[in-house]
Design a protein with these regions (language model features):
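DUTPase catalytic domain/fold
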Residues: 1-145
Length: 145
């Protein structure tokens, strides 16, 4: 699958995979000066890229495992969604869960993009839902022994 992508700045780096079988494409910061993210603070970091995600797909913006586990930096909304009709700059709301300030520099890997198919659905309002063994059992209800 090919995705049309546009560099909005000369310094923007195209998404890149860390290995040939990686599902995620690394997204890189494109900032004119270093950005300091204080502990428990969120800052919007641009990538300098815009793209055309094909209809029937969305771009999921996920944390990079090492960046979140080792340094406490992750997308603030846990998973960002880039819809197929969005044409603006791809940005990452990066949150610092750590206890020390973190400096983000240009061309640094900040998140990963996974292109995911989805189904378009319609919702059918009903008065009653079908019964299941689980019923209305919610959080933790299936983990009990």
């Amino acid at each position: 699958m090919e995705i049309n992508i546009k560099r909005l700045t000369d310094s923007a780096k195209l998404p890149d995979r860390g290995s040939t079988l990686a599902a995620g494409y690394d997204l890189f910061a494109d900032v004119t000066e270093d950005v300091t993210i204080e502990p428990h603070e969120t800052k919007m970091i641009g990538t300098g890229l815009a793209m055309e995600i094909p209809v029937g797909y969305f771009g999921g913006i996920f944390a990079r495992s090492g960046l979140s586990a080792k340094e406490g930096l992750r997308p603030a909304n846990c998973v960002g969604v880039v819809d197929s009709d969005y044409r603006g700059e791809i940005k990452v709301a990066l949150h610092n869960d750590g206890e020390v300030a973190r400096v983000v520099t240009s061309a640094e890997k900040i998140a990963q993009l996974v292109v995911v198919p989805f189904l378009s659905v319609s919702f059918n309002e009903v008065d009653k839902l079908t019964d299941t063994d689980r019923g209305e059992g919610g959080f933790g209800s299936t983990g009990k022994h």
